[in-house]
């Protein structure tokens, strides 16, 4: 029988499951090296935590790791139902809030090691969290793909910690009651990108699709299709970072100016950026709330103990 200690939270409605203990040892390498070990040798632990019957498609896991550097508060490896994530904005906010709950950190600035580099997270006195992300940049502008049933769709390819295709002119209604249609449209766009061979840098697959719309109260409202078939309930930290990179490249948002990004369900992140060589360094601010603390149990004779493959 296996036991995995977890603490759940949600950031703007998007859940994060922090794995505190119970995973196999991954060695003392970087977070990228440990991710490779986890994916290659112990992927069933990811599946057990995230897939049904213990998880769901919308859940993001965050394996809490000892950092390489003594100056870092923690290391983390993010994963979901489809595999592994280089970085996760909402997940980092959830992780920092969880570390505070565990008594590991107090308000202040903390460095978090991720597989794509270190991020700086500030826990504020009101327990909201600001995340200074990795470098974000636009890789390609005005990329056109033919989407069956929808015709030509134009968008930008950008990196914000994950690869995104960002579309503003899509003709879809970005609203909570329309998520089924939005997911179908975004899935069709992602499939069209794959057929056309459109990728991120060095052939990296584009696994996130982000649709933007005007919002009467905030700067924008977005729908984000994550890897697999789930959509982001939060405004998506890495997606907002990619959006800032595109706005900066187009001269539509100056450094230091706040951009307020709403999600499809109405939760909000505040974001700004600092100019940097080759792109921008975004800072995303949001809040997470604790929702559960539990021990997952995997019985030896459970036929679905290691998850139900979808």
Swiss-Prot record:
What reaction does this enzyme carry out catalytically?
trans-4-hydroxy-L-proline = cis-4-hydroxy-D-proline
Residues holding substrate = 89-90, 208, 232, 237-238
Inhibition and activation profile: Inhibited by iodoacetate, iodoacetamide and by high amounts (10 mM) of pyrrole-2-carboxylic acid (PYC). Not inhibited by PYC at 1 mM.
Signal peptide region: none
Q: Which GO terms describe its molecular function?
A: 4-hydroxyproline epimerase activity
Q: What is its EC number?
A: 5.1.1.8
Active-site positions on this chain: 88, 236
Note the Gene3D superfamilies from the entry. Answer: Diaminopimelate Epimerase, Chain A, domain 1 (3.10.310.10)
| Main enzyme class | isomerase
Query: Anything else the record notes?
Result: This enzyme does not require pyridoxal phosphate (PLP) as a cofactor.
Q: Which family does it belong to?
A: Belongs to the proline racemase family.
**What is the protein name stated in its UniProt record?**
4-hydroxyproline epimerase
